[in-house]
Amino acid sequence: IGMGYVAEKHLKAIKQTGGNLIASLDLRDGVGILDSYFPNCSHFTEFERFDRFCSGKDIDYTVVCSPNYLHSSHCFFGLRIGSDVICEKPLVLHERNLDNLIVMQNLTHHRIWNILQLRLGDTVEQIRQTIQTTNSDNVFLEYVVSRGSWYDYSWKGNEEKSGGPLFNIGIHLFDLLLHLFGRKWEIRRWRGDHRYQDGTLFIGGFDVGISLDISSDIAPIRRLSIGNEDFDLSKGFTNLHAKSYEKILTSNGFGIESVRPAIALCESLRNY
């Protein structure tokens, strides 16, 4: 469900792990990217026809790549038709909605799996070792990506639909930080707007400075600094959707509770 930018990563992962995509849904009818992966996939632009096609079929997984504010309802759909669900980040925009999804999981006996691909990066173990041996308690995460004026007019620029940069850009970074440094956090200071977020968190005994910027015209920066050591988050983090699918196919993926800490943190920062 959803054939935007991130969908191709899922198409590639489905192909690499031996899967077959039988149906897709997007408001656009120009989805030529399917030709490179699943040319026989039935494409729909209307949810009702997509629903009718999927109902009663033996579908193993529903993949959710729609705009953030629709993730929860599309996860409900996937569970309702009797499939597991693979959902892009963020699973929800409000922590309370996680509990509703858990209830639906229990009723249907199917699972929701989350794409938390940064946890699977080749560099993660090296970062973890640095955390354990460093004499410094200072950490800085800088993430800069350029987004043109189109961003403000798309659903991504609408905070009600995307959750703002905290959920749309920052969620996978916050998840990685909590995965590495610990799930308990405290907000020391925070400020931001629809294109810039900046502040300091206290996580696992470390003062973690964070700067998220999607308004800059400079080259992208994806850097995590621990003391004097820098880690480029652009390297060692490739083909991770396929790795995520491999874990999901063996029931070793990341479930609903895995995303709760980062969802709670982003929601708290948004309301700070």
Outline where the language-model segments fall.
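Receiver (REC) domain switch-region micro-motif
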Residues: S24, T62-V63, L141
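Beta-loop-alpha module in the N-terminal Rossmann-like domain of NAD(P)-dependent dehydrogenases
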Residues: H10, F38-I102
